[in-house]
Amino acid sequence: MAESFSFDVVSDFDRQELVNTLDQVKREISQRYDLKDTDTLVDLDKENIFIITNSELTLNAVNDIIRQKAIKRNLSLKIFDYGDIEIVSGNKIKQTILLKQGIKQEIAKKISKNIRDQIKKINVSINGETLRVASKSKNDLQLAIKIVSELEESLNIPLKANNFR
């Protein structure tokens, strides 16, 4: 059995689902009685979501709506890294939500070490912001996927296994 099997460990999300989520959030803000006249702005750029609104109460309501809609669209809540609340012009406040994507080098090393400590006959290589896990045994790979899913909780980043070969 010279054939080798592998999969990639990545930390990413479906950007289109996030865009759809924020469209639903904007629609709900414009229709909800308590949020309709608050001049709340929700905006998305490449790496952040910006929320500008009148009060902290409104901000908390918008954050709750974002979480609810993200869950319904199968987005992990771990992709959101909530920043501090800033006071902008006059009576407006702003919060920046950083979107976590990619596995940082030190976290990749922790994941790699953890997998190798528990499974001896497995190769883990770090390729930029992804990890490639390879083995000759499919059972070892299934065990590695289980280890990765357990690590996801302790590291507080969304991890997915894909590109099974």
Swiss-Prot record:
Domain of life assignment: Bacteria
Keywords, ordered alphabetically: Nucleotide-binding
Gene3D superfamilies: 3.30.70.860, YajQ-like, domain 2
GO molecular function, a single term: nucleotide binding
Keyword Nucleotide-binding: yes
GO cellular component: cytosol
Classification via InterPro entries: DUF520 (IPR007551), UPF0234-like_C (IPR035571), UPF0234_N (IPR035570), YajQ-like_sf (IPR036183)
Nucleotide-binding is among the record's keywords: yes
Protein family according to the UniProt entry: Belongs to the YajQ family.
Role played: Nucleotide-binding protein.
Protein name: Nucleotide-binding protein P9301_05061
Organism: Prochlorococcus marinus (strain MIT 9301)
